[in-house]
Amino acid sequence: YKIPGRVGDSPIIGAGLYVDNEVGAAGATGRGEEILRTCGSFYVVEQMRSGKSPQEACEALCKRIVDINGGTKNINFNDKIVAVSKDGEVGCASIKEKKGNTPKLAYWSKNGFNVYEGTYLIEVT
């Protein structure tokens, strides 16, 4: 289901999904307009290329989205980002969450099923 007039970012390469075999991959969900505006998944992969971990790269995108919207007082939406490096390191972050409700990423690795707890920028009540 999609609200009429809303933009879907998921099928747009570089926005909802981006993969580079030399670096890793990232995916995003939430307010599509913000993910499109920042080329969100591409941005995360490029942050990893420059040396950031997947977690740091996801957090960097959340901060970028908040900054280009004029700060936390203007954030009335949420975006969530996941990333994996070519070596299998993962990360996830969201712009806002309730206290104690950290974003999580479920994934399969050579060690079996795992759940990774990420971070968020803004705590909501």
What are the roles of these predicted feature ranges?
Residues 1-125:
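N-terminal nucleophile
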